Amino acid sequence: GPSSGFFGTR
């Protein structure tokens, strides 16, 4: 996912 935002935590 994106490097920032909710999916950036992965």
UniProtKB/Swiss-Prot annotation:
<dbReference type="GO" id="GO:0005576">
    <property type="term" value="C:extracellular region"/>
</dbReference>
<dbReference type="GO" id="GO:0007218">
    <property type="term" value="P:neuropeptide signaling pathway"/>
</dbReference>
<keyword id="KW-0964">Secreted</keyword>
<feature type="modified residue" description="Arginine amide">
    <location>
        <position position="10"/>
    </location>
</feature>
<keyword id="KW-0027">Amidation</keyword>
<protein>
    <recommendedName>
        <fullName>Tachykinin-related peptide 3</fullName>
    </recommendedName>
</protein>
<keyword id="KW-0527">Neuropeptide</keyword>
